[in-house]
From Swiss-Prot:
Family: Belongs to the bacterial ribosomal protein bL31 family. Type A subfamily.
Pfam families: Ribosomal_L31
Protein name: Large ribosomal subunit protein bL31
Disulfide bonds: none
Any one GO BP annotation for this protein: translation
GO molecular function: rRNA binding; structural constituent of ribosome
Length: 71
């Protein structure tokens, strides 16, 4: 085998941008930034909030009210 052709594998701290928790991974990359981790992801936390869906329903109801009052 040839020596020194493989990248250096080291432990890297990966920081979640949502909750700020740090995880330690093995990687060849210097810095890892996570959008969502197991600490704050809805699947792992059991949180079943439907913020997006709720907002869309409210928007639909506002449009419906406008159409009723203008008609």
């Amino acid at each position: 085998m040839k020596k020194e052709i493989h990248p250096n594998f080291k432990e890297v701290k990966a920081t979640c941008t949502s909750c700020g928790k740090e995880h330690i991974f093995g990687s060849t990359v210097e810095k890892i930034s996570l959008d969502v981790c197991s600490n704050c992801h809805a699947f792992y936390t059991g949180d079943r909030s439907t913020v997006k869906a709720r907002g869309r329903v409210e928007r639909f109801n506002k449009i419906l009210e406008k159409s009723k009052t203008s008609a």
